[in-house]
Amino acid sequence: MSDPIRPARRAKVERKTKESDIVVELDLDGTGQVSVDTGVPFFDHMLTSLGSHASFDLTIKAVGDIEIEGHHTIEDTAIVLGQALGQALGDKKGIRRFGDAFIPMDETLAHAAVDVSGRPYFVHTGEPDYMVEFTIAGSAAPYHTVVNRHVFESLAFNARIALHVRTLYGRDPHHITEAEYKAVARALRQAVEYDPRVSGVPSTKGTL
């Protein structure tokens, strides 16, 4: 829940194109209450993990052309989620700004680092080459792991953050993907939380 002496950090963003219709509601100071429906079951699972482990309250409803392929819906959802994150951050006063996390999942270890800098940048390294061809099947629409990069890149550029995601090692594409999402979640949680020793914008320039 929001601190009574702090402004609410919430956003609702809607985006409609010929390929998708997406609504995202986000509260950065939530408790991990998440409801996601994109029509792509594995992506729903990943976004639920992201919201839960970031301790965001997150509601996502996406309707897209998944009968053709899920890529449009997945990437457009990441765009809107990034926009909501950027809006919810507001003036960024009092936040820690930086965050990072190592996340193990069985044989896999992933790492994510975040700078809420206002300067969007994205680096993605370490995934095995076969991740560009692997498909995680779903009852409604499959998830092609090649989109991992697109999801995080769209999130970073639309939230205007610097985001580095890397897989140090791993074998199972499911574990690699899930560890990356959870690492991003934990890094975001750390970066956007309030620092009790900081009252202004955490930058020597005075703005982010």
UniProtKB/Swiss-Prot annotation:
Top-level lineage group: Bacteria
A Pfam family this chain is assigned to: IGPD
Compartments where located: Cytoplasm
Annotated Gene3D superfamilies: Imidazole glycerol phosphate dehydratase, domain 1
UniProt GO BP: L-histidine biosynthetic process
Enzyme class: lyase
Annotated CDD domains: IGPD
Major subcellular location class: cytoplasm
GO molecular function: imidazoleglycerol-phosphate dehydratase activity
EC id: 4.2.1.19
Record-level GO cellular component terms: cytoplasm
Presence of keyword Signal: no
Catalytic activity: D-erythro-1-(imidazol-4-yl)glycerol 3-phosphate = 3-(imidazol-4-yl)-2-oxopropyl phosphate + H2O
Pathway: Amino-acid biosynthesis; L-histidine biosynthesis; L-histidine from 5-phospho-alpha-D-ribose 1-diphosphate: step 6/9
SUPFAM superfamilies: Ribosomal protein S5 domain 2-like
Family: Belongs to the imidazoleglycerol-phosphate dehydratase family.
Protein name: Imidazoleglycerol-phosphate dehydratase
Lineage: Bacteria, Bacillati, Actinomycetota, Actinomycetes, Mycobacteriales
Chain's gene name: hisB
